[in-house]
């Protein structure tokens, strides 16, 4: 009987050591409202597209260096979006005019760049704008 209790006690001590570690989410929002976080440059020329992408890469590099593992990337604001859509136009922050095609898919680019850094990328959509 004592041997069974001893073995069970050891088993209960060993099992938690084999359990998966908790996944800690260290996230940051990247907002496109008024270009507060991103972008600062308009994508109206090939140089503008390159600069806009570099700005996002720089933000992601800083987040990775600060040990973040998740990005909440704003993809929709007030009826406009940061990805190609047949329903809503591109956000004016990308090119300076509503519906202006920036020449690339900002959401796909953000996802790709996050994954290169081992980070998750979640689409953040404003559904109830206030103010």
Roles of regions detected by a PLM:
Residues 66-102:
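Aromatic-lined carbohydrate-binding/catalytic grooves of carbohydrate-active enzymes
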Residues 1-4:
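Positively charged n-region of N-terminal signal peptides that target proteins for export
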Residues 9-18:
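Hydrophobic h-region of N-terminal signal peptides that target proteins for export
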Residues 22-28, 64, 68-78, 106-131:
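Glycine-rich, aromatic-flanked loop segments that form ligand/cofactor-binding clefts
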Residues 45-66, 93-117:
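Aromatic- and glycine-enriched glycan-recognition loops and surfaces
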Residues 37-39, 80-84, 130-131:
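Extracytoplasmic/secreted cell-surface and envelope-processing proteins
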Residues 20-49:
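Boundary/entry segment of secreted carbohydrate-active catalytic domains
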